[in-house]
Amino acid sequence: MQATAPQHSITWFEIPVTDLARAQTFYEALLGAPLRREILGPEELAVFPTSGGEASIKGCLHLSSERTAPSSQGTRVYLDVSPSMDAALSRAVAAGGRITTPKVALPPGMGFFARIHDCEGNVVGLHAMG
């Protein structure tokens, strides 16, 4: 039996970048995991790793175009940086990012969130249980 995402759930996201190699290096440092390069039609992507099987949310970095551009406004994606928010924030800064919202505790059992500016000018959310 193949797992599928629940109906009406988010299944894909794209983070626009102006320099794919630079952004891939940044996100690999932030997450401590490699991104996979793929070419889909005319677009080259750097795909985020997943560990939740077919039902997990998938996404990528893609070169910006006339339709998209890096931005600190608009929809915000939150990436799981478990097990440690503190370690992830340190990696983000070391890789050239900047913290825009420091670590914030959520209600008991929900972990922590923070927000960063990536190396491309996007504001990205981070979430971790620790």
Outline where the language-model segments fall:
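Vicinal oxygen chelate
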Residues: 1-18, 36-39, 66-130
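Short, flexible, solvent-exposed loop/turn segments with mixed acidic/basic and small polar residues
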Residues: 1-4, 65-69
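Core segments of cupin and vicinal oxygen chelate
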Residues: 7, 14-56, 107
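Conserved active-site tyrosine of GNAT-family acetyltransferases
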Residues: 23-27, 92, 121
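Residue-level detection of beta-strand scaffold positions
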Residues: 27-30, 45-47, 76, 89, ...
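Residues in well-ordered beta-strands of folded domains
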Residues: 49, 62, 78
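A short, structured beta-strand/loop element
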Residues: 56-63
